[in-house]
Amino acid sequence: MAIADVTIIPIGTETPSVSAYVADVQKILEGYQAEGKIKYQLTPMNTLIEGELSDLFAVIQAIHEAPFQKGLHRVATNIRIDDRRDKKTTLESKIESVNKHLQP
């Protein structure tokens, strides 16, 4: 299972706020999560998505398209993928691994 760190950057918006665009992306992600294809977590600066690599690419394409559906003509998307294949990793397991090292 892979984990993607994705930031969608709508360019040319009428206001500096992008929360409406973020909400649109979250709605798309909720649909994929309801289908059992991904898990995701919104953070203040990006969205983390966990799933099979092929599903991640499909999801990323769908959320990249969302601002265009609102009439924008330019979108920049930053993607970082952690695809570890020697063992199963999840969003939670990565945090648990760090927390183990923090225990006295």
Curated annotation (Swiss-Prot):
Coiled coil (residue ranges):
none
Superkingdom of origin: Bacteria
Q: Extract the InterPro entries matched here.
A: MTH1187/YkoF-like, Thiamine_BP, UPF0045_domain
Pfam name, any one = Thiamine_BP
- Which family is it part of? Belongs to the UPF0045 family.
Protein known as:
UPF0045 protein YqgV
